[in-house]
């Protein structure tokens, strides 16, 4: 009886332990499954991070470079968004002021007026409306007054001594006087129409190639060989139409004073005083207008129209078209070599 009872207790304990183990095994299984899932997720995240790093490295390696010597995975006509990163527009842009441009245009008006005054002197010499002594006195007076005026308005200028200057003047005009007979007959065989046409072309060339920057004080050395030679040659052509050697000498003397010496005088005058520069322009234009009016009203009107256009219309036009200026600079430009003094070659 006791043995039967003991066996029954053992069987109950075994069943209890079996049921206990059966009830706890699903929990353990769930824990193991969750651990496995977490491990897989971590592995996937690591793989994604590695893929992102690889993509970033590939993007860095494949980034477009402005190199012609390196092969890149881009088409020949590909334009990257960083291509124009170094573009600079209108870096040297200078906004012009109307009255400043007008004052600078006076230099052109003065030169045109000087050419016309020279032609007027030739016309009066040809028609004998001005006497020869008056022409000689006027040429000598202009030379002396101009030399004295430069000394007064610009004492710092580097001039030769008075004695040396007069020696140079005597030598120059003495040479012209000695060559006057040759110059008078040099083109004597040319027809009048040829002389007028060649003179007109040469005087136009003189105006186009004149050194206007020197008169406007943009340079300190008068350099206009083509312009000066064209004007002197034009005076030689006109001299062949005059009646005497003295007339030729006076005309070429005027040419030297007008085309070689007068720009130097105007350069020093403007550097000394802008008011004197404006006053000289007004005097020249008024004198030329009155002289042309005595010859022909049409010529006077044409002259006034040309001077008015150059002085007022052209500056307005220049300022108007400034808004269309588009100067492009960038790293593709040629390198500028800078000298030790700071200027560019």
Swiss-Prot record:
Main location: endoplasmic reticulum
Annotated transmembrane regions: 106-126, 133-153, 159-179, 194-214, 222-242, 245-265, 276-296, 301-321
GO terms under biological process: GPI anchor biosynthetic process
Membrane topology: Multi-pass membrane protein
Skewed-composition ranges (Low complexity): 13-61
GO cellular component terms attached to this protein's record: glycosylphosphatidylinositol-N-acetylglucosaminyltransferase (GPI-GnT) complex
Entry keyword annotation includes 4Fe-4S: no
Annotated pathway: Glycolipid biosynthesis; glycosylphosphatidylinositol-anchor biosynthesis
EC number of the protein: 2.4.1.198
Similarity annotation: Belongs to the PIGC family.
Subunit structure, interactors included: Component of the phosphatidylinositol N-acetylglucosaminyltransferase complex.
Record function comment: Part of the complex catalyzing the transfer of N-acetylglucosamine from UDP-N-acetylglucosamine to phosphatidylinositol, the first step of GPI biosynthesis.
This protein's name: Putative phosphatidylinositol N-acetylglucosaminyltransferase subunit C
Organism of this sequence: Dictyostelium discoideum (Social amoeba)
């Amino acid at each position: 009886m006791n043995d039967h009872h003991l066996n029954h207790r053992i069987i109950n304990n075994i069943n209890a332990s079996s049921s206990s183990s059966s009830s706890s095994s699903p929990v353990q299984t769930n824990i193991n499954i969750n651990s496995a899932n977490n491990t897989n997720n971590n592995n996937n995240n690591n793989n994604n991070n590695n893929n992102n790093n690889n993509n970033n490295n590939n993007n860095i390696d494949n980034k477009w470079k402005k190199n012609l010597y390196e092969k890149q995975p881009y088409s020949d006509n590909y334009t990257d968004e960083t291509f124009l990163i170094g573009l600079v527009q209108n870096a040297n842009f200078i906004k012009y002021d109307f009255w400043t441009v007008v004052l600078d245009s006076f230099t052109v008006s003065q030169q045109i007026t000087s050419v016309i005054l020279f032609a007027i002197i030739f016309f009066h010499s040809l028609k004998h409306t001005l006497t020869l002594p008056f022409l000689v006195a006027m040429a000598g007076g202009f030379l002396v007054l101009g030399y004295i005026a430069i000394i007064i308005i610009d004492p710092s200028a580097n001039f030769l001594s008075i004695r040396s200057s007069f020696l140079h003047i005597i030598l120059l005009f003495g040479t012209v006087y000695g060559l006057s007979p040759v110059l008078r007959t040099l083109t004597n065989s040319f027809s009048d129409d040829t002389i007028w046409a060649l003179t007109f072309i040469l005087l136009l060339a003189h105006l186009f190639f004149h050194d206007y920057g020197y008169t406007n004080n943009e340079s300190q050395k008068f350099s206009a060989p083509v312009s000066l030679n064209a004007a002197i040659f034009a005076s030689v052509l006109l001299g062949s139409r005059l009646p005497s050697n003295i007339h030729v000498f006076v005309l070429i003397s005027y040419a030297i004073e007008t085309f070689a010496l007068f720009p130097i005088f105007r350069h020093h005058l403007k550097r000394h005083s802008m008011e004197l520069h404006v006053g000289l322009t007004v005097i020249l234009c008024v004198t030329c207008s009155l002289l042309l009016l005595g010859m022909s009203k049409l010529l006077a009107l044409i002259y006034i129209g040309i001077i008015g256009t150059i002085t007022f219309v052209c500056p307005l036009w220049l300022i108007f078209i400034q808004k269309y200026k588009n100067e492009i600079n960038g790293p593709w430009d040629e390198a500028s070599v800078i000298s030790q003094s700071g200027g560019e070659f």
